[in-house]
Amino acid sequence: MLLLDCNPEVDSLKHLLETGASVNAPPDPCEQSPVHLAAGGGLACFLLWQLQTGADLNQQDVFGEAPLHKAARVGSMECLSLLVASDAQIDLCNKNGQTAEDLAWSCGFPECAKFLTTIKCMQTIKSREQPNKDHCVQVLRLKRSFGSEEYTSGKRKC
């Protein structure tokens, strides 16, 4: 509860939640949604609740920052993990051309930056493998075929 008393973003978020604001409604001139406020405050519990109610986790504010940027700016590994697990786009750039990873590095949170770098690499590898997976499915279908040309000497050809 001490955190609630000393963080103005939490007060704003608490007010929004009490008044029944839409989860994606930009409540202030900076167009920050409750998800932006939760991520920017490092409040994983509020963020999780917002995500469970259908909040847009890629919504950008007037600075072009998504909730992922806000979490990276404050070094909240918990919020970053929640957003990444919910399929937030990690390659979004703000109006200064910075990704969340860039912000984590520039704000002095190397562990968050390394986490985002790892996720980006994993997503890149996964996207490169996707066409290969389709090819593998086709090859597997061929392997399951028992045509006379494919099945010789008790072994199936690829």
UniProtKB/Swiss-Prot annotation:
InterPro entries noted in UniProt: Ank_Repeat/CDKN_Inhibitor, Ankyrin_rpt, Ankyrin_rpt-contain_sf
SMART domains in the record: ANK (SM00248)
Keywords associated with the record: ANK repeat, Cytoplasm, Nucleus, Repeat, Ubl conjugation
Primary localization: nucleus
Residue ranges of ANK repeats: 1-25, 30-59, 63-92
Name of the protein: Ankyrin repeat domain-containing protein 37
Entry PTM: Ubiquitinated by the CRL2(FEM1B) complex, leading to its degradation.
Compartments (UniProt record): Nucleus; Cytoplasm
Annotated PROSITE patterns: ANK_REP_REGION (PS50297), ANK_REPEAT (PS50088)
Motif placement: Nuclear localization signal: 129-149
UniProt KW Cytoplasm keyword: yes
Gene3D superfamilies xrefs: Ankyrin repeat-containing domain
A GO CC term assigned to this protein in UniProt: nucleus
